[in-house]
């Protein structure tokens, strides 16, 4: 079994005095023998606090790699403070794969010009074409694309770029083409650069800019793997036919086959074993063994330190408590690597019986093998505050604008008359009379007005990019292994329920889970319309520190970037959409907010479905509580084994939950996460640019 990666803590005297940590026995005393018949499930032991402090009192020198390992196992929320990552100053930051909390470390994108977003959208569409990697070298086909880009209306393109921006109607539509000749030629050059890499790897980095990328592939999932996974779905659906688990709040349209919100780790309820002894072969032997971990009533106070997560002057940089849960945590399964480099589960997948479904375990192991190259492609490692390791594009396609002022006539076309299009009056915006910021005229849709137009910058000269990842998580974390959270779900539509609504913007998990990347396997779609995942990111609120402009003279910049830069201009960047078609693998880092689009039945007289496997990668830099620590909590699993075993004990261990209790915890967990998502969305929306404050 892979060793747990020991987190290196910083604990000062104030923490030791003010924060009460759970009392857990030393490593040597916490071992539980699988064959033991003693009932060891008990409340927290009363071993001395000094034993825990011994885990926590390592010097900061350990953070620089001077101490590679520690005796024992350490987990945030157990024998480390739940908010242990808050302890670092900027000069102490350890490596992480960022998590997309509002204004979090490593999760902000540089603001992109509308032309760059348009380029990303155009290239995303072109790489969906069959044999795009060959067509992009065919001059006749490219000329046809060029003519389409030159003549087609850009209204839809512009509205997608500006979608969700509450003040975008105050920014005039560019009168010049967004897709200029230079922009189009850059796109073709970039696609020709990506084509050989796609042929070699099957991977397409898409919607990529400045160190952030999404990865799609329609041939990464082999026919054999797809067959294995489809068989897994059919097996589970058949076994659960008499007791279908419809996800709460989905109007009985989302069937959970495996979901981490059922039987999660529950503080002060779940049995816990400090050392990672519960594996998939002996998991049920540990039922009833272990200790409770008390609910966390107060987070550690690290004082006014600059921390590694986020910094907002109004709250000293502390993370809002809603971002972490002191009640629940999803349970990942531990994954090690065999000698040949392939993935192997060393602990059970929560809610997937390890004895009943060995073939499904094998299939998901193969899916992890498939996902790792895509994760390597899209993960960005933050080594230090100003040092990052990433694959592919790591800078904008446009020169950074450091100085721009509306009084500079070279930034504008000469005065001209143009018509404000009627087609921008969408029913989800309240269009009426609008004011053009640069001139102050009243603009009425469909009327001719007089004004000047911003000259949009052209992209830099194209330079080839090496998309090869500089490192692989399989090699980097070979000794410690990975932790992966698994979800298997089927969206079922019927003539009575023909429409699936769009989802909400979110990142995956809370900070407890430390999810750093997602891999989605779209296995099977029948009689449903196309669906997409939409992506967006937060941008830095401190843009005014980098761009010099006069007082309130930033209207040209607003037109270039397609956003308000004064009060109320949210620091949110739309990246675009990726189709979630059958047979596709989609991977992305957990720095993007994303949401699923709505879809419906094609033929509303027949049922339809969309089925997918989700793999969520826990940041391997920091170990969290997993199924290697928590014996199975499903009472029915134990009951089946107990009945089959001759002379088995009849008393039900107190650590087990009924389905009804697990469902109650799921509802509470979902309610807690809804509050977190609302808080995160509020914090993201309230971050605004401050160009008006000079």
Task: Show where each model-derived region lies.
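Fe(II)/2-oxoglutarate oxygenase catalytic core
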Residues: 2-5, 9-25, 33, 39-585, ...
């Amino acid at each position: 079994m892979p060793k747990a990666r020991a987190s290196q803590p910083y604990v000062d005297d104030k923490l030791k005095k003010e924060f009460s940590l759970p009392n857990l026995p030393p490593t040597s005393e916490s071992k539980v023998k699988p064959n033991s018949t003693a009932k060891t499930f008990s409340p927290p032991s009363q071993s001395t606090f000094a034993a825990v402090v011994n885990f926590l009192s390592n010097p900061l020198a350990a953070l620089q790699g001077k101490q590679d390992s520690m005796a024992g196992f350490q987990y945030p929320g157990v024998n480390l403070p739940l908010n242990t990552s808050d302890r670092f100053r900027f000069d102490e930051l350890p490596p992480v794969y960022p998590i997309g909390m509002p204004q979090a470390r490593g999760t902000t994108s540089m603001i992109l010009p509308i032309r760059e977003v348009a380029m990303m959208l155009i290239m995303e569409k072109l790489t969906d074409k069959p044999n795009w990697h060959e067509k992009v070298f065919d001059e006749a086909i490219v000329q046809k694309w060029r003519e389409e880009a030159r003549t087609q209306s850009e209204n839809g393109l512009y509205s997608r770029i500006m979608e969700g921006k509450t003040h975008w109607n105050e920014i005039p539509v560019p009168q010049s083409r967004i897709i200029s000749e230079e922009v189009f030629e850059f796109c073709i050059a970039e696609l020709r650069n990506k084509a050989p890499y796609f042929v070699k790897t099957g991977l397409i980095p898409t919607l990529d800019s400045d160190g952030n990328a999404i990865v799609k592939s329609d041939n990464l999932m082999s026919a054999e793997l797809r067959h294995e996974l489809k068989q897994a779905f059919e097996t589970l659906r058949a076994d659960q036919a008499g007791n279908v688990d419809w996800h709460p709040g989905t109007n009985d349209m989302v069937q959970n086959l495996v979901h981490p919100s059922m039987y999660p780790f529950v503080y002060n309820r779940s049995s816990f074993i400090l050392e990672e002894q519960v594996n998939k072969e002996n998991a049920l032997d540990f039922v009833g063994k272990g200790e409770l971990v008390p609910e966390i009533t107060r987070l550690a106070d690290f004082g006014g330190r600059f921390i590694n997560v986020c910094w907002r002057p109004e709250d000293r940089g502390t993370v809002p408590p809603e971002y972490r849960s002191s009640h629940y945590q999803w349970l990942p399964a531990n994954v090690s690597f065999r000698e040949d480099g392939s993935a192997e589960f060393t602990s059970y997948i929560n809610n997937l019986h390890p004895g009943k479904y060995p073939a499904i375990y094998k299939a998901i192991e193969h899916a992890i093998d498939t996902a790792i190259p895509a994760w390597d492609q899209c993960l960005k490692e933050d080594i230090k505050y100003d040092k990052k390791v990433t694959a592919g594009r790591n800078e904008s396609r446009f020169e950074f604008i450091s100085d721009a002022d509306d009084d500079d006539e070279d930034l504008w076309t000469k005065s001209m008359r143009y018509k404000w299009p009627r087609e921008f009056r969408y029913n989800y915006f309240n269009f009426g009379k609008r004011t053009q910021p640069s001139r102050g005229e009243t603009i009425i849709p469909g009327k001719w007005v007089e004004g000047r137009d911003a000259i949009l910058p052209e992209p830099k000269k194209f330079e080839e990019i090496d998309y090869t990842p500089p490192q692989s998580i399989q090699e980097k974390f070979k000794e410690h292994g990975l932790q992966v959270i698994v979800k298997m779900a089927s969206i079922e539509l019927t003539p009575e329920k023909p429409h699936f609504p769009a989802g909400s913007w979110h990142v995956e998990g809370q900070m407890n889970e430390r999810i750093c990347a997602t891999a989605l396997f779209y296995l099977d779609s029948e009689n449903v319309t196309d669906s997409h995942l939409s992506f967006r990111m937060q941008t830095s609120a401190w843009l005014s520190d980098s761009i010099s402009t006069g007082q309130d003279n930033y209207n040209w910049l607003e037109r270039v970037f397609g956003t308000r830069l004064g009060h109320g201009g949210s620091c949110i960047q739309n990246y675009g959409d990726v189709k979630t078609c059958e047979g596709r693998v989609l991977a992305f880092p957990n720095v993007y907010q994303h949401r699923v689009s709505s879809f419906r039945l094609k033929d509303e007289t027949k049922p339809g479905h969309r089925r997918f496997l989700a793999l969520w990668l826990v940041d391997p830099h920091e170990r969290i509580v997993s199924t290697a620590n928590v014996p199975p909590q499903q009472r029915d699993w134990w009951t089946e084994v107990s009945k089959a075993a001759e002379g088995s004990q009849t008393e039900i261990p107190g650590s087990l939950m009924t389905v009804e209790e697990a469902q109650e915890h799921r509802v509470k967990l979902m309610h807690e996460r809804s509050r977190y998502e609302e808080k995160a969305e509020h914090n993201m929306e309230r971050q605004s640019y401050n160009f008006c404050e000079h």
